[in-house]
């Protein structure tokens, strides 16, 4: 299972701290991040934790960018996804409501 994470600066800094201080396990993944914390990305890349880097619009996840976390099977097909808003995981109904209101601030932070 491959997991693609989408972070805002706040959550990414927490991941960096958890890895460096608590030595928590991070799977190989693609991290979407803001330019402003490229030093942290470089640090994690040097540890071999990050294998790919991309950018998002304004460093936030939106409906065009996809969900906050996507789970892939071995064939590369998405079989699960999670959305977050203000640090809280959203259920399927909440996502439908936000999309119907044309909300574009769904993010993991």
What are these regions (language model features)?
Residues 3-6, 14, 18-109:
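Glycine/tyrosine- and acidic-biased, solvent-exposed loop/turn segments at the edges of beta-strands
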């Amino acid at each position: 299972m491959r997991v693609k994470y989408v972070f805002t600066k706040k959550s990414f800094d927490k991941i960096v701290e958890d890895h460096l201080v608590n030595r928590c396990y991070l799977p190989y993944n693609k991290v979407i991040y803001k330019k402003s914390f490229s030093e942290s990305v470089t640090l994690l890349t040097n540890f071999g934790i990050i294998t790919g880097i991309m950018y998002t619009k304004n460093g936030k996840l939106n409906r065009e960018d996809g969900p906050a976390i996507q789970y892939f099977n071995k064939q590369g097909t998405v079989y699960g996804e999670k959305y977050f808003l203000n640090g809280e995981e959203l259920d399927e109904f909440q996502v439908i409501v936000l999309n119907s209101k044309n909300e574009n601030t769904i993010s993991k932070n």
